[in-house]
Each structure stands twice: as C-alpha cells, then as structure tokens.
Amino acid sequence: MMYKKIILLICLIIGLSVILYGLKQYRYSTDEQKVTIQFSSWGSESEIKILKPLLLDFEHDNPDIKVDFMHIPQNYFQKLHLLFASNTAPDVIFINNQYLPVYANAGLFEDLSGEDEIFHFKDFYTKSLDALRWQGKLYAVPRDISNLVIYYNKNIFDRYGVSYPDNDWDYEKFLETAKKLTHRPEVFGISFEEEPIFYLPYLMSFGLDKEPVFDDIATHEGLKIYAGLRSKYHIAPRREEAASATMAQMFLQGRLAMHLSGRWLVPKYRQEAKFDWDIINFPKGTAGSVVPLDASGWAISKASKHKPQAKQLVKYLSSKQSIERLTQSGLIVPARIETANSKYFFDNQQPNNADTFLSVIETSRPTPVTVNYREVLDTLKTKTEKLFNLN
C-alpha cells in the first residue's frame, strides 16, 4: 500500500513538472513573438501616473507589442541627442515644436504627412499640426496646444475697485488697469519673466512675424515695450523685488494682480489659490492680440525597425480616449478638437473663462522656430539681461 502511494506521488510530481515546464515554454514562446518598442517622454509625476496605465492598456489591446517606457524627467533633449548619436534612439519620441526642427532637418524623424488614414488629421486643430511641421512635412501627431493667457486675481481687482478685463481690451487699457492695481511693494499689476516665451506676446502683438533677433527693429521695439513694465511704469516686480519667488508664487501670495502664463498652472492654482481667479486673453497691440502657439506630440524615429508597431502606439496615444484621460489632469489644452470642446476640458472648475484657451488658438501664431532656435533664445537672454534690469 505504501509502495503504491509513493508511485502515485512520484507520478503526480512528474505530471506537475511537465505542466509547469510547458507553461514556462509557452511563456517564453509568447515573449519571443512580442515586438518590443521603446518610447521616451518627459513629464511630471502627475502626467506619468496617467501615462503608465495608458501604456498598459495599449499592451493589453495589442498583446504582440511590448512598450519599454523611458521616462526622462530632466535634461530630456540632451539625453535624446546622445541616444540619436549612439544609434539607440527610441522608436516613439515625445517632442515639442521648438526642438522638432533639429531632428527633422537632420532626417532623424519619420515623415507622417501621408498617414491620414491612420491618424485622421482633420480631428486636430490645424495650428497644432502646423506647429509640428518642418519644411511642409508633418513629423509628429499632436497631443496638446500650449498658448498664453493672463490669469487675474479677482479679489485684488475688487479691493481696488478695478473692473475685470474683457476680451476686447487693448494695450492702453491693459496699462491703465495694471497701474491701478499696483500698490508697491505689496502688490504689482503684472508679472515679469525674463524667459523669451513670456515676452513674445508683447513682440508679436506689436508686429513681429518672424524669429526674434535682438537687433531687428520689430524685436527691439517690442522688447522696449516689455522692459518698460519694470523700468518705465514699475507695474511689474523688478528682480530684487521678486527675490527668490517665482511669478506663480507671487500670484498665489496675492502680490501679483495679473500673471501671464499657460494652461500648465491650472492644477496648481486650483489646488493652492486662496482667492477667486480667472483668465483673459492678452490685450490687443497694433497687430492684434497675438501670442505664440506651441505644441507637443509623438514622433517616430526614421531608424526604427518596428515602424508599424510604433505607428500603432502613436495612434493609441493620440486617440480620443487617450487624450480625454490626459486632459482630465487639467494640465493641457488638447489638440483634438472634439476633446477640447468636451466635458473633459470644460470640467466645471476654475477658470470660469476656460473657453479663452480655445479662442486664443484662433488669434495665436505657431512660434517661428528654426534649427538654431535654442541658440537664438540663448542669445536673446544674454542681450536682454541689461535691458530688463534698468532701474
């Protein structure tokens, strides 16, 4: 009897071993059949928390594709340069319009212009597509649009008896409003940041229609207008008055009545602002109310060995359901027209004038970038240092 039990136990062990071996071989076989594609992106912690589940859902819907996600939170483009230089670039690359020309001009990105059947470009804002073109060819499918609006603290307006701005205001009305709101050193009328993105609206609304060059007349005139907010009218905080505080921090502290910035601050202001606030478009200059329009999206490496799978991933990430989930974060203005006009963007939270982000698209212009755009901006930052700090 004992002998039979031992035989049965041995048979059971052998049987289980065979089954486990078979499962192991099946798993190895399945993994070998999968195509692995690499995808790189920058992004805040909150963005990545949304992105990672999207990638898992993609893998679930596409069991033959595995996504190797490369999150590069800092020095993204320096690392991307190195990856291309060493022929180890990802298959799918998150990119913005300011850096896209560098890679597109070098022939490193796949031309997606002829892929309308896959991506249905009519579903996206035309200007978001224009921003991601280089020399007439489309090199990325857009995720979002980035433009600038003026955030304003309604409590400060109420305190000093100043009417809220309307979307038809001009630069003279803007100056008049900012002067009334300025009560130094406690409160300044308008923000001042020395990064080019924040003074481009002042240049473009007064006639600049090309890449900014310091010695160009239109650029220089616009820069003088901007510098005057500090030096001439003193309605914006000078460097020593802001000290180590950012403009966003000053706005939250109630020290700025108006702050020129982008959609990316909405989640922060929703969470941290202890006052009522809203947004309005940039005032009209001699050329109208014109702010730069930037865009981010997904490009595909020309050297990718898995282009069909890479296109599948880009199609999924840029799809209606993916963009809806990304939009719910409050961080982006979606490039998909339907999503931008949906409950996912108009979510019954501040700002009340959320439609301003969309109306500004109509009057904005894609930032005039070139292959050397970053060098142009670095030169501008050097040359404007003195101009912006005249007391």
Regions found by a protein language model. Give the residues of each.
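C-terminal capping/gating helix-and-loop segments adjacent to ligand/active sites or protein-protein/ligand interfaces
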Residues: 335, 339, 349-391
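Periplasmic solute-binding protein
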Residues: 101-108, 128-165, 192-211, 293-300, ...
